[in-house]
Amino acid sequence: MIIKKIKMDVCPLDVYEQIRGENTFLLESAEGVPKVARYSILGKAEGKVIFKNGKLKVESFTEFGDKAKDLEGKYECPLDALREVRNEYLKYIDISNIEPIPRFKGGLVGYLSYDIIRYWIDLSNINPKPINDLKFPDAEFFIVKDFISFDLKEKVINLIAEDDEGIRELERIIKNAKIGNNDNKEEKTTENKDLKIKSNMSKEEFIEAVKKAKEYIFAGDIFQVVLSRRIEIDLDNLDHLKIYKKVREINPSPYMYYLDFGDRKIIGSSPEILVRTDYKDNKRLVITRPIAGTIRRGKTEEEDKELEKKLLSDEKERAEHVMLVDLARNDIGKISKFGTVEVTDFMIIEKYSHVQHIVSNVVGELKDNYDSFLAVKATFPAGTLSGAPKVRAMEIIEELEKTWRGPYGGGVGYFGWDDLMDLAITIRTFVISKNKGYIQVGAGIVADSIPENEWEETERKGMANVKTIESLLK
């Protein structure tokens, strides 16, 4: 692999428009902590791997993408299958020449569905069971060799390819983006019309689920559980990239993504790390960064500070956050060397365009015999999307939610060739299939939750996303 650095004088989205289409991706950072929101990457896939119903399928678009075809078949866990794919491609690729790049050097880009938990957590005895109506893959990842990386801190674009011909192709894409040439625009007509919207749970059903969850809390089974419902929107002829552009405008975040798998698209803007690995001082670190506690931004600097104080003095928000930090420490502790787990940021405020969050940072040094795939398994799913204790909370989710979650509450991001991994929690995300858009919204249920208020919380979240679509139809 070779690398060419050029001045950053064009934005990632403009460059992505040059290649948009099936089997392309954009992972973009806009706001947040600089060490998190530093890189944006985009490219065309060499192939993709799909894990579903215990089986791995490999689709290749190039000769390189075909290298893992022999790995197709049954596996006990999608993470095991992804590891085998990663290791197979390492036989054919040399990343030693691009070591100066701190993060992504190529690898697997895609998503893990929440429902992969079923491969290592036994939920078979839970009744009633949610239905798997949409039948999304358990995991779906692009195979990425040649790509473009934007370093927002250094203000440079890294062109990374296997050979000079690949570099020239990436240069051509950048050049066309700079001069505004775009023969690749997808123009779809839109009409000003009422959206067709439906929820997989009625208000009465959701409120009953909250009441049942509170019974489990008072019985001592759990401290908290996150219950969610799914909203379906008919997208008609809407250009899906316009949805990403609007989400990017309204809710810029450290983790924004547009993954075009053809039949399926994953479009979102998540503020929260699920888990990531890093190297520092010859140590392999595993990191998670729980977010719990949110309040709006102030209209003035003075009001902003007052709202920050209000959030940090809210005993309910603080108690929930501390509980989730303890859960994160426990998860990270399973895979870290003894005595290395620490909370490096505790209950700090991070400010975004419209909201401010309470955030903590939990770090550990990864055990010698653990890789990024085992790190995901130990921390998946995020406590902020399941509850605590985590396994019992997931059992209650299984009982009370109507359908499988699919990508919602899982992870989206990458596994690098070099075992660096970075996954965001899949929230604030549109999942598109067969021209239907699905958005899942949840509420954290605790002992003093008021069922009506929890429904209203999901309604606020859901309608914010519906308005995003409505604004594109005017």
Curated annotation (Swiss-Prot):
BP terms from Gene Ontology: L-tryptophan biosynthetic process
Keyword Cell division: no
Activity control, per UniProt: Feedback inhibited by tryptophan.
Cofactor binding summary note: Binds 1 Mg(2+) ion per subunit.
Binding site for Mg(2+): E320, E457
Enzyme class: lyase
Highest taxon of source: Archaea
Residues reported to bind L-tryptophan: S29, P254, Y255, M256
Listed Gene3D superfamilies: Anthranilate synthase
Catalytic activity: chorismate + L-glutamine = anthranilate + pyruvate + L-glutamate + H(+)
Entry keyword set: Amino-acid biosynthesis, Aromatic amino acid biosynthesis, Lyase, Magnesium, Metal-binding, Tryptophan biosynthesis
Cofactor(s), names only, from the UniProt record: Mg(2+)
Protein's UniProt keywords contain Zinc: no
GO terms of molecular function: anthranilate synthase activity; metal ion binding
Pathway annotation: Amino-acid biosynthesis; L-tryptophan biosynthesis; L-tryptophan from chorismate: step 1/5
Coiled-coil segments: none
Assigned EC number: 4.1.3.27
Residues given in the record as chorismate binding sites: G293, T294, Y408, R428, G442, A443, G444
One Pfam family hit: Anth_synt_I_N
Family statement drawn from the similarity comment of this UniProt entry: Belongs to the anthranilate synthase component I family.
Function statement: Part of a heterotetrameric complex that catalyzes the two-step biosynthesis of anthranilate, an intermediate in the biosynthesis of L-tryptophan. In the first step, the glutamine-binding beta subunit (TrpG) of anthranilate synthase (AS) provides the glutamine amidotransferase activity which generates ammonia as a substrate that, along with chorismate, is used in the second step, catalyzed by the large alpha subunit of AS (TrpE) to produce anthranilate. In the absence of TrpG, TrpE can synthesize anthranilate directly from chorismate and high concentrations of ammonia.
Assembly and binders: Heterotetramer consisting of two non-identical subunits: a beta subunit (TrpG) and a large alpha subunit (TrpE).
Protein name stated in the entry: Anthranilate synthase component 1
Species whose genome carries this gene: Methanocaldococcus jannaschii (strain ATCC 43067 / DSM 2661 / JAL-1 / JCM 10045 / NBRC 100440)
